[in-house]
A protein has these predicted regions:
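Short, surface-exposed patches at the edges or C-terminal ends of soluble domains, predominantly
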Residues: 1-256
Length: 256
């Protein structure tokens, strides 16, 4: 099923044309009229859907693939790096190159799923440097108004007011995120950082430590209490008038 273009015509529209929201996120992290977005490769990243690729082209956004394994640094013409659902971790060398790029005012759009095999430790360490960390497991929602089809991990998160979410809130839409990982924001952010929780669960949500092997929707020992963020926008002031912007969404279904 294509979750990014599914609509429900009832008392409320709870899904949306996902490519519109994603291009809104890219527009947020880049300010150039004709931006160039590099798609990171080398870690089993998922291909972008045809509808999203078409929407990107309509926005005059140029895309190209990028392998940091073979380059000394991020190309100078990079307006944003998109990392889409990597299945394996980045190397420490790649982490260093990404940190250098972001530290100079670069922009990142990160889309992840709960890991199926290996933990993405280096990528998560990079994001922890920007005040956001993951919680192991798959998020299950207890509030019946925030999930669909009787499946508590098919989430309908609350939407915060933000430039990125304007296409949703103006249209009265809800976001459908099947299979998400919880994100938490550090309490002690450095002064240069600002983090906005774009999509959030209720306080009764929890993360099932069993992950993809879960056998019950009930809370068990080892599960972690929410609430969680499922998408965040991060802004880091790296110099006078220069910011590094990052958007992180913790469910790759957004671009399927």
């Amino acid at each position: 099923m294509d979750y990014t273009s599914y609509y429900y015509y009832g008392t409320e529209n709870w899904s949306f044309c996902g490519e519109s929201e994603l291009t809104s996120a890219i527009d947020y992290v880049v300010s150039e009229n004709l931006p160039k977005v590099y798609l990171l490769t080398g870690h089993g990243e998922s291909s972008l859907s045809d509808s999203f690729t078409s929407a990107v082209k309509q926005q005059n956004i140029e895309t190209a693939e990028l392998s940091l394994l073979t380059l000394e640094s991020v190309p100078a013409d990079t307006d944003c790096i998109l990392i889409n659902a990597p299945q394996s971790d980045i190397s420490l060398d790649e982490q260093s190159k990404l940190l250098e790029y972001l530290g100079n005012g670069g922009n990142l759009f990160l889309i992840t799923d709960p890991p199926k095999n290996e933990k993405l430790s280096n990528l998560e360490a990079l994001m922890a440097d920007y005040g956001v960390s993951t919680v192991d497991g798959i998020v299950v929602e207890s509030d019946q108004s925030l999930y669909v089809w009787g499946t508590p991990y098919f989430l309908l998160p609350d939407i915060a007011s933000h430039a990125i979410t304007t296409p949703l809130t103006d249209g009265g839409y809800r976001v459908l995120l099947p299979i998400s990982q919880g994100l938490t924001v550090a309490d002690d952010l450095r002064d240069t950082l600002s983090v906005t929780k774009l999509l959030t669960t209720s306080s009764s949500a929890f993360a099932k430590a069993a992950g993809y092997d879960l056998t019950t929707y009930e809370k068990e020992e080892g599960d972690v209490n929410g609430p969680f963020a499922l998408a965040v926008a991060i802004s880091d002031t790296v110099d006078d008038g220069i910011t590094s912007d990052i958007v992180w969404v913790s469910s790759a279904a957004l671009v399927d």
